[in-house]
Amino acid sequence: MIDYTAVEAYGNPILVDDHDNRVSAFREIVQLTKKPHNALAIVQLSHPGRQGSKALNPHPISASDVHLKLKWAGNEFAPPRAMSLDDIRHNIKQWGQSAYLAWQAGFDGVQIHCAHGYLLAQFLSPSTNLRTDSYGGTPTNRARLIFEIIAEIDRRVRTHDPTFLLCVKLNSVEFQDRGTTPQEARDLCIALEAARVDFVDLSGGTFEGRAFHHVKDSTRAREAYFIEFAEMIRPLLQKTKVFVTGGFRSASGMALAVEQGACDGVGIGRPLAAEPYLCRDILAGRVSGAIENLVPLPMNTQASGTQLHQVAKGEELVSDWSASAEVERWIEENERETKRKIQVLPRVDSSGFPWLRAERGFAYLK
């Protein structure tokens, strides 16, 4: 997160300044990430806008004062305030500062999160951007903030280090009646290439319209939720690379997406929470894909958080969500944790994910 006062959920890491030597702590993460294969370390920067838990973000800001009226994993969302021009100028500097600190920590680049209904997606979408000034109205105006952030990151970092990578995570389609269209998103990708964005990571959907439920059968067959959009824009981009994140589970599906030219690379999220060495094992030919996850949507995001806690605590096992008994145990614990969090509000005393000691799982450390 780029702002102490704007977090999306419990446990969000924040990179705003060097308080408590956090740049050194992030540098440690970078060093571990790069070993032993000298992998690239790119950190995602984000601002939730209106889409942050009411308990943690009681006075949110957004492109406009459009309230997100739903509950998500036990969270409610406060009505947002439309950002003033001063707010926007300050926000631009925050993105630049966080990118600069990431560079100081040794990251090879940053990803600007413009997807999943968070702040920059709120500016892009006519559903949430009702502004009548230079940041609203036309697709160009709604995207203006993103390009001003890119210019600030160029000023703070890339003028000093041209090798610093810049990525934009983008909604391919918002799956809302008045959301951004694939054509608008395609035009945006072309403009991002002109702004020297190194790669775009295509995803989609918001809390209001979970994209993972609204995909074509042909897309489901190839696993990636947003691959059809990638196929449309990749031939139009000369230098900017296209990645697709969302839905990949089998090695064959990942390979096919790249071999057929739909994208240059694939992103994997939740499967890595269960199997930290999944990528290594796929490349070595030891496994053919990720294990099945029986935790129902949308709770499986929370379930992945539990797995990350198990890894962070050095537990011997990571829960196996392909085992129905383990899933049932987790669902019961999740209900208890949700009730407990509500009772202690506004105090925040945990990361928000239910804690569970695995009974059926993977000995990932062996």
Each PLM stretch: what is its role?
Residues 1-366:
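Flavin-dependent oxidoreductase catalytic cores
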